[in-house]
């Protein structure tokens, strides 16, 4: 019985130890979200971009640029899209004061519908006001002319 208990405890510890999948920058970024001494400021070049008109079946990338206008490192700690037709990527390393970062939204019109579209990307940062930012892109999808 003691051997079974000991084996179970070792197995449980092994599984929980393997669950730590956060990188060092994620750990630092997440702790910066809660530590007011690490708050900084961000300025977005654009928070609304109209990409114009594309054909159904086309894919595009919309780029949102930000600048760290504070005096502490800026962390984009979470970026998520409003739907499955948009896949976001972003600067995952610390953005030092005065430097620029990027959020890119890759949009696949095959996963959407013809007509006007309005898509959003949500960004969480280590800034005191407006910790969550909403980046929006709009445009029109048309059926290609045969």
Language model features by range: what are they?
Residues 108-114:
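Short, surface-exposed loop/turn segments at beta-strand-coil junctions that are enriched for proline
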Residues 56-63, 114-120:
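Short, solvent-exposed loop/turn segments enriched in Ser/Thr/Gly
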Residues 19-54, 128-146:
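Long, low-complexity ectodomains and other extracytoplasmic segments of secretory-pathway proteins
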Residues 14-17:
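C-terminal motif of bacterial Sec signal peptides marking the signal peptidase cleavage site
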Residues 49, 99-105:
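Short strand-edge motifs at loop-to-beta-strand transitions and within beta-strands
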Residues 66-70:
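Asparagine-centered strand-capping/turn motif at beta-strand->loop junctions
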Residues 1-4:
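Positively charged n-region of N-terminal signal peptides that target proteins for export
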Residues 71-99:
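Surface-exposed binding patches on compact interaction domains or structured appendages
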């Amino acid at each position: 019985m003691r051997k079974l208990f000991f084996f179970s405890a070792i197995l449980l510890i092994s599984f929980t130890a393997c669950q730590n999948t956060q990188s060092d920058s994620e750990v630092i970024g997440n702790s910066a979200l809660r530590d007011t001494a690490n708050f900084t400021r961000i300025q977005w070049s654009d928070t609304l971009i109209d990409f114009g008109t594309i054909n159904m079946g086309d894919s595009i990338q919309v780029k949102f640029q930000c600048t760290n206008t504070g005096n502490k490192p800026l962390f984009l700690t979470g970026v998520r899209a409003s739907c499955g037709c948009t896949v976001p990527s972003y600067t995952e390393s610390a953005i030092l004061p005065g430097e620029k970062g990027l959020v890119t939204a890759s949009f696949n019109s095959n996963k959407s519908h013809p007509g006007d579209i309005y898509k959003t990307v949500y960004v969480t940062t280590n800034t005191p006001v407006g910790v969550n930012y909403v980046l929006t892109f709009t445009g029109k999808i048309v059926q290609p002319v045969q």
